[in-house]
Amino acid sequence: MDPLFQQTHKQVHEIQSCMGRLETADKQSVHIVENEIQASIDQIFSRLERLEILSSKEPPNKRQNARLRVDQLKYDVQHLQTALRNFQHRRHAREQQERQREELLSRTFTTNDSDTTIPMDESLQFNSSLQKVHNGMDDLILDGHNILDGLRTQRLTLKGTQKKILDIANMLGLSNTVMRLIEKRAFQDKYFMIGGMLLTCVVMFLVVQYLT
């Protein structure tokens, strides 16, 4: 397990270094860097699945520490995934603004019944208002993604905590009644998390409907 863990840990640090390259990359190379980072993140998630299996096969006196190390790696890579998505969202928003600005400047607006040109200032003001609405919706969607990512991270943390509690309970020889109570609480937490995710989606939908 240790060699695979060290490789994965090293790869996480390499991705953190690559994230800094995104801010300085030009338009031609930024997509290449993004794809490289995403491919590395996907590979780490695959390795984490293998590490989880290996950690469960560790001796009882090493199992808890092994799972803690795997959980920490999982937490780090999930934050890297969120950071990459946030960067891509900001980049897409900038590119969309640039395209709309270029289209607006290259387009001549005329009325239907005369050759009177619509004042450019009014057109720019209208476009600016639309852009603010789009940016507000994009920010709302991004916040929703971050909330859902946080809920997924919380679920993984609760799942890992449940495993640790059950392992400790087995070592201490707790009764079946106590074990069932622990499992019941974990089951209830799962439904609370799902309810929170659904509520977030409903709120996002209602706000988007209101803005549009």
Swiss-Prot record:
Outcome after substituting residue 144 to W: In EPM6 and MYOS; no effect on protein stability; loss of localization to the cis-Golgi network membrane; loss of function; unable to rescue the yeast strain lacking the ortholog Bos1
Which stretches are Cytoplasmic in the membrane topology? 1-190
One GO molecular function term?
Answer: SNARE binding
Q: Which residues carry this modification: N-acetylmethionine?
A: 1
Outline the subunit composition: Part of a unique SNARE complex composed of the Golgi SNAREs GOSR1, STX5 and YKT6. Interacts (via IxM motif) with SEC24C and SEC24D; mediates GOSR2 packaging into COPII-coated vesicles. Interacts with BET1.
Q: What does this protein do?
A: Involved in transport of proteins from the cis/medial-Golgi to the trans-Golgi network.
Q: What is this protein called?
A: Golgi SNAP receptor complex member 2
